[in-house]
Amino acid sequence: MFSVSSAPVLRPSKVSIFSVSACQIICDGSQINWGEGKINCDERQINWGEGKIDVIPSQKPAIINLFENRFSHRPPFEFVLHLRGNFERIRALKDLLKKYEERAPEIVFEWNDLETEARGWVVINSLRGGAAGGGTRMRVGLDRNEVISLAKTMEIKFTVSGPAIGGAKSGIDFDPKDPRKKGVLERWYKAVSPLLKNYYGTGGDMNVDEIHEVIPITESFGIWHPQEGIVHGHFDPTDAEKIRKIGQLRNGVSKVLEDPNYCPDGPTKYRVADMVTGFGVSESVKHFYSIFKNESLQGKRIIVQGWGNVASAAAMELAHAGAKIVGIIDKNGGLINEAGYGLEEVKNLFINHKVGNTLEIDGMLSFDEVNASIWDVKADVFIPAAASRLVSANQLQRLVNAGLKTIASGANVPFADKEIFYGPIMSQADDQLSLIPDFIANCGMARVFAFLMSYEDRDLTDEAIFSDTSRTIYNALKKVHDKNSSLTNVSNTAFQLALEELLANPKLQKTN
């Protein structure tokens, strides 16, 4: 029973005492009225009598929207308790993130090229399990702190993809369009080859190609495969086991796909590395709908950001599952089709209108045109799979207002937050809809590396590789669902599970 009190007091420990007449919530001039008491929401806190919740200014629009859409016809105490619980979850996560971010990386290797202005860093956040892994990227302006944050991100991803190793990253501050790039990479990999031989595994990343640059250059310095350090440091194999594992890595990543279930028909040959990350993003959506909603993707409306390998492969796999692609926004332009593109149309876009990593088709909208309207298109699922830190708070809110229910992060850190992991825009998304985090949704390639290192059967099939990636993503989402079965705060829960594992077990033993 709820009693009427003359004092407008909302006590979270005794929710039966509150005023039911004439309340209002005040957010810096924006008022939502529901009765006689109020909740003050200034730039620092929400007060509800005996307690308070810290609030940052950028969260206020989301709080107002949340009330208007979900709580305007419900008792005031429910809204307060929701805010309280949500902010307490965020506070708990931020405490874990603070501990994780403040832990200094175990190894930082700094390199200065004697022939150019290039500088580079290998950051190994930890040698958890005897080794660490993370790709090599190159861009102008890259710095040590960026590489540290990426190494920490990789360590979180390995809690899902495996193996149970530390996170690492290589970064080179140099213009990838400079004709001296090849020489810079050759001198870089010569300098870091002792790490790659013993306990560090790398691969391609931004502006560094795995097949055409990383593999041939590292081979010239006696590295059997860019992941050799993980094989040696984590698995501690015999000579015969090492040869077999590295052989599987060589063959598996560059394997030409033959099964039509995992690649489109046509003259172009696609490799595992071309398709598996986008496939994993699609599987994360499919498994999420199955586990959390007991629904299929039939008829679901999808918006995709980007048209590189990840975005285009994800779109095609989602269409294969029965979804409709209603919008594509790429850096040069895009398409909007309210009726939705089906499988054959998406295949055509994938095969015939993907030039490099961009969409090119006659009659497509300019970037300004598509950017002005795509965020208001009705959709069930959004796949940000272009560059990092692109999605703004305004774009997110427009998607939500148009009915968006789910986001699967094909890109690493897709939101335009300055924070490494869980900034205010990501937090807003996580509270308003179902947000599948990047370290689950886009873990496909990392999982393939782990699978190839541990797989015992020499006959590697397309189905074996891709079904393992699918199963890994399913298990990660099931673990999240077991702790939090609601449709919101999915990323918060996933982060807490990963960070609790890393902070509790910073040093795992090698795998024998």
Q: Which sequence ranges carry the predicted segments?
A:
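N-terminal cap/recognition module
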Residues: 124-156
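Adenosine-phosphate binding glycine-rich loop
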Residues: 400-512
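Long, intrinsically disordered low-complexity tandem-repeat segments
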Residues: 25-27, 31-53
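Short, Gly/Pro- and small/polar-rich lid/capping loops
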Residues: 67-110
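Low-acidity, Ser/Thr- and Arg-rich intrinsically disordered low-complexity segments
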Residues: 3-6, 11-21
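Glycine/serine-rich phosphate-binding loop and adjoining beta1-alpha1 elements at the start
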Residues: 159-297
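Rossmann-like adenosine-cofactor binding region
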Residues: 333-435
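Glycine-rich phosphate/diphosphate-binding loop of Rossmann-like nucleotide-binding domains
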Residues: 261-375
